[in-house]
Amino acid sequence: MADSEQQEDYKIQGFDADTQSLLKTALKEPGSVDLEKAASVIVDQSLRDATFSREAGRMCYTIIQAESKQTGRTVFRSTLLNRLQVEYKNRKETRARSLQEWVCYVGFMCNVFDYLRVNNMPMLALVNPVYDCLFDLVQPDNLKREEEVDCLVLQLHRVGEQLEKMNCQRMDELFSQLRDSFLLQGGLSSLTQLLLLEMIEYRAAGWRMTDAAQKYYYSEVSE
């Protein structure tokens, strides 16, 4: 537990002292701080900082669990989900304005989906929004941007298997589109083609990568 707290402390070092205090208290005594503000701070930072967005889901999960246990309320979770919904509705404008913010948003959404559970199951309310973001990433124009391809691959490695269990049909549709792009779309970089092929084979192998495949793709990407 001490290691976990140190990791969380480490993730919030970029905040000012007051915000660090707010988040540290929210993690341990959520009933004594403004959880709506804490949720907004975490989302805002996640949209700016890719490293933070990849880890913030764990912090959200910790606060949600602590609030439920100590107060029986869901203020933080409700605020977080409402904010994610707003950002989801504005995602096309976000992408047009800032590619980095858009990629951070997708990473954060998938991270929250990965960590948040209801009765030991992923949150149903997040399944289709996460899928919609992944479908956005496999659009022809998006596949020409390395940042979006990297994001797509990272998120499918993170939550692809869980998503497929929640809605197999949409995953079939996503990979049908991904295969078509790999086979038919011109103008893709050799790295993008390699990453798309890796994802196709990764899913075909039951969301597992063989040692041989890992060595092959790793050596190709690093060259």
UniProtKB/Swiss-Prot annotation:
It comes from the Eukaryota. This is MIF4G domain-containing protein. Interacts with eif4g1, eif4g2 and slbp; probably tethered by SLBP to the 3'-end of mRNAs ending with the histone stem-loop, it also interacts with eif4g1 which is bound to their 5'-end. The keyword RNA-binding does not apply. GO terms for biological process: regulation of translation. GO terms for molecular function: RNA binding. It is found in: Cytoplasm; Nucleus. Belongs to the MIF4GD family. Gene3D superfamilies: 1.25.40.180. Pfam families: MIF4G. Keywords: Cytoplasm, Nucleus, Translation regulation. InterPro entries: ARM-type_fold (IPR016024), MIF4G-like_typ-3 (IPR003890), mRNA_TranslReg/HistoneTransl (IPR051367). Residues 9-206 form the MIF4G domain. PANTHER family: EIF4G DOMAIN PROTEIN, MIF4G DOMAIN-CONTAINING PROTEIN. The keyword Nucleus applies. Functions in replication-dependent translation of histone mRNAs which differ from other eukaryotic mRNAs in that they do not end with a poly-A tail but a stem-loop. May participate in circularizing those mRNAs specifically enhancing their translation. One of its GO terms (cellular component) is nucleus.
